[in-house]
Amino acid sequence: VSSGTPKETVTPLVVELWYAEAPELGDPRLLQALRLQWPATELQMESIVVPHGDPASPLLTVIMTASPLGEGGKALPDVSQTWDWEGAEAAVSASRCSLLVTEMFGDGRTPQERWDAMSAVVCEMAQLTRPTALSWPQSQRVGDPELFAAGDLDGLINVRYFSISNDPGAIVMDTLGLHVFGLPDVQCHYRDREPGEIAAMLFSTAVYLFRSGDVIADGNTISGPRGDERFVCIHERALLAPSRQVIDVDLGEPYAAGQRDRR
């Protein structure tokens, strides 16, 4: 890890399930179905609480009704950085209300432990309640609920794409989502390469960080998409919002864009 580079703050995971008409969280049939998987599931203060692991110190998944559209700036999710679901815009347009799924007591747990717990509940809720769309506000991605499975990292980690208006041909791509675990995302500022191959490289690197931690030190290299390519990595602040730590992947000449200090 780059010395002197501040670590990100760990924040609770959030997944939003969108509906044309939201299910009633107090429905005994819903609670009964969840208890088949998690027997200690309870209805508390109009929220469903699902405990995982040690009963004395459980990781909790909490399901609650989200604020209505328009209240406090509440809006439908943005689909502009969702690239792999053609039906995203139509599904979101048909949505009118949502449930929030979040977590409590995630500190001290590995990213895998936290996501295994959260994603299992999201998957079960998607099967039981049939939402129109899943939204990951922390990664700016919208997903098809019918394709989501427990443990899937698609959605948790999103690869974004931006063209740079004042530098024709230059592109910035980054991952978004690892910052909630206190881990760096991955970015690449480049030109004249196929975006699909860069996206695959960034996603696979982000998955490696998710599973292994922030183990890519400044000056280390990762494999590129083509044959024996090796690209140097360095920690820095993200070029694009939200402000966070990233690992920048330098494609070298002639593909790297922007200004770099390679001393």
Annotate the PLM regions.
Residues 28, 116-119, 196-201:
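Short, well-ordered alpha-helical segments
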Residues 36-45, 120-134, 208-217:
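Structural alpha-beta junctions
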